[in-house]
Each structure stands twice: as structure tokens, then as C-alpha cells.
């Protein structure tokens, strides 16, 4: 904003408070080695393995959970109600987890775009690029997001007019086309978005 680079950005972003909780995996489950990322929309959570045979459990923003929009500099503590809700939801899928005596986890702030789809684009200021509005869902896409941004930057710096002819990137592993126009700053809100961490 200080450089005036955001003057033509049509999609807004806002800070959203999030909690991800950390619980020990039952030894017999060996989630640290055999676990996988799982989105459980029936229970409103996602889980993924963490080091030391632990489980990370976060929210998929079910309708019953209010969203907590905060100041960008927000710092917070784990809220007992949120911790209990997510751990009990995890127990519906994995009853052997139980309810740990100690609450552990992290509190952070997601940078959420209006349609929960990130903005990967150039700006109206030459040499300024943005990768913003990535919500919480882009931690798993960091590698390909970096690749796409590098391709976009190289194309624009070499004279490509991304605004009138969106850069097309080929996925390095899938060889599928990625239309960078889907992530541009001047798009309208995508009505087909899940409007959630799923993107």
C-alpha cells in the first residue's frame, strides 16, 4: 500500500484468526508415519500428521463456527471452547485419540481474499508483485505457488502483457496448464469458490 501498488486491486483481503491444535496420536495408530492429510467436512475439521507421532487438527470453517476477523497484528491464546470443539470433532473420527489434559496448538492469522482464492499477480507499479490472500489453504501449495510466481515475474519482466493476455504456466510434474488469470488482482469475486479454507 505504501508504494501505491494496490490501487487497482479489485479483490480485498482481511485477517482471519485461526487455531490449529496439536494432540498426541494413539501409539497403535502411528499417525506420524502412516497418517495423511484429511479434510473431514462432516465434522468441520482437517487433520495432518505432525512430528513425534502427533496430529494437527484445524477447522474447515463449518457454518456453526463463527469466523473471527481481527486486526492484522492480532496475538492470541488458544480458546478453550475452540480447542474442545476441534478435539471432540476429531474424536468422532478417531475415538482412540481421547481428550488430552493439556491444550496445545498455535494461534495465527490467515490473509483471506474476498473469495478465498489467492492473488498471484503483478501490480500497477513496475517491479512490484503480490502473492497475497492465500488464506490457510496455501501452505500445501507453497512450492507450486513459488514456481507460478517465478514464471509470471519472468514473463512480465520480459515484456509479456499479463493484464490482456494472462500468463499460462505448465505444472512441472503434472504438465497441466495453470491459467494465472484465475488469480489476478483485477478479477471479480468467483461465485463458484467454496468460500472456505478449501479454496
Predicted regions, residues:
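C-terminal lid/capping helical subdomain adjacent to the catalytic/cofactor pocket in oxidative enzymes
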Residues: 124-199
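Active-site substrate-recognition segment that forms the wall
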Residues: 1-126
Amino acid at each position: 500500500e505504501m508504494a501505491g501498488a494496490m490501487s487497482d486491486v479489485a479483490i480485498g483481503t482481511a485477517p482471519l484468526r485461526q487455531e490449529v491444535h496439536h494432540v498426541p496420536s494413539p501409539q497403535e495408530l502411528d499417525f506420524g508415519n502412516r497418517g495423511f492429510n484429511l479434510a473431514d467436512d462432516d465434522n468441520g475439521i482437517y487433520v495432518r500428521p505432525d512430528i513425534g507421532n502427533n496430529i494437527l487438527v484445524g477447522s474447515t470453517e463449518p457454518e456453526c463456527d463463527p469466523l473471527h476477523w481481527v486486526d492484522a497484528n492480532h496475538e492470541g491464546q488458544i480458546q478453550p471452547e475452540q480447542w474442545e470443539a476441534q478435539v471432540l470433532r476429531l474424536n468422532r473420527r478417531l475415538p482412540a485419540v481421547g481428550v488430552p489434559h493439556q491444550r496445545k496448538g498455535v494461534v495465527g492469522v490467515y490473509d483471506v481474499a474476498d473469495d478465498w482464492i489467492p492473488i498471484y499477480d503483478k501490480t500497477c507499479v513496475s517491479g512490484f508483485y503480490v502473492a497475497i490472500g492465500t488464506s490457510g489453504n496455501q501452505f500445501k501449495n507453497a512450492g507450486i505457488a513459488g514456481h507460478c510466481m517465478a514464471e509470471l515475474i519472468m514473463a512480465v519482466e520480459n515484456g509479456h502483457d499479463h493484464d490482456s493476455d494472462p500468463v499460462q504456466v505448465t505444472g512441472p510434474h503434472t504438465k497441466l496448464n495453470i491459467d494465472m488469470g484465475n488469480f489476478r488482482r483485477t478479477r471479480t469475486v468467483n461465485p463458484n469458490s467454496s468460500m472456505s479454507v478449501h479454496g
